Each structure stands twice: as C-alpha cells, then as structure tokens.
C-alpha cells in the first residue's frame, strides 16, 4: 500500500476502512497537523462513507483521497456498489461516488485520472490552504483486471540504472 520504503507514502496504515475515521479523530482531538485519509472505492462504500459523513457533519478539515478503480482490488477483484454489477454479475445500480460525497455535504470535490500525478499534487497543495473537508477521487480501472493488463507491456530492467527499490 505504499507505506514502506522506497515509497514511504503514509505515516499510519491501520485496517481497511479506518483511514477517514482515524484522520477525523486526529483533527477532533486537537492535532494541529493536516490529516489525509486514503481509501479504496469498495472500502469507502462498505465502511468509509459513515466516517466521511462525520467529517462533513463536524466540519473537519480532513482531505480524503478515494481511489476509484471500480472493483474490490485488495481481496480479489469482486464487484462493489460502484461497479454496476452484483457479485453474481447481474446489472445493478452504479453508485456515483462524487454525487454521494456531495450529497453528504462535502463541497470541495474533484475527480482526476489516477496516473495524472501533476494534477493530484497540484490539487493537494492547493487544498492545504483551505480549512474545510475535501475529497479527491482518483479514477482508473484496476491494473489487475484482465482487460487492463492487456494495455501494459512487459518491462525490462536496465540493470546499470537499477537502484534496488524492488518496484
């Protein structure tokens, strides 16, 4: 999940669904640091939306990043309320994350392509200046899905340039 080196992308990694509630708890406890929460779309539907409602209700300035890849990647690519299919593969109502986030009262919401690092970075830097809840939805299908895998070519390691990061 990007916690350990070489990425070191997070300070805390708890359990699936805890990020938004833990970040909100830090704010409510008086921590002066800005708190970020990172959560996948499926986990957001299962447990994260309740915590985000508390963030909105209490006006906490948590920045939540919802990684929308339209599937439950972490546990085996099961369908979820945002995929448009049931677990049995039957058509279902597709929950619109952005509409749901706005409906619970979050006003600062943006959807960006997950691989557009510049857009993500500039958005987060801009949002550090505001004192309100915000949600960034990163949008890209899971790379583990068979139809997505076909888009990626095998990579060759240039050994003399390798720094041993294991990525």
Sequence positions of predicted segments:
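A generic structural motif
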Residues: 65-68, 138-140, 165
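Short, structured interface segments
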Residues: 127-147
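Short conserved micro-motifs at the rims of enzyme active sites and ligand-binding pockets
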Residues: 76-77, 147-149
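Disulfide-bonded cysteines in secreted/extracellular proteins and peptides
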Residues: 40, 142, 162-165
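Thiamine diphosphate
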Residues: 2-134
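Cysteine-centered iron-sulfur cluster-binding motifs in ferredoxin-type domains/subunits
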Residues: 27, 56, 156-167
């Amino acid at each position: 999940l990007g916690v350990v080196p070489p990425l070191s992308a997070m300070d805390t990694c708890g359990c699936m669904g805890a990020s938004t509630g833990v970040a909100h708890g830090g704010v409510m406890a008086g921590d002066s640091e800005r708190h970020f929460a990172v959560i996948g779309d499926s986990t957001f539907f299962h447990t994260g939306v309740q915590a985000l409602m508390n963030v909105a209700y209490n006006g906490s300035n948590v920045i939540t990043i919802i990684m929308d890849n339209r599937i439950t990647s972490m546990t085996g690519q099961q369908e979820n309320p945002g995929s448009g299919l049931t677990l049995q593969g039957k058509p279902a109502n597709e929950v619109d994350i952005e509409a749901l986030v706005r409906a619970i009262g979050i006003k600062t919401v943006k959807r960006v392509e997950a691989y557009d690092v510049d857009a993500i970075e500039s958005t987060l830097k801009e949002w550090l200046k505001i004192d309100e809840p915000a949600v960034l939805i990163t949008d890209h299908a899971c790379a583990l899905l068979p139809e997505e895998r076909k888009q990626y070519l095998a990579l060759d390691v240039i050994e003399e340039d390798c720094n041993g990061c294991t990525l």
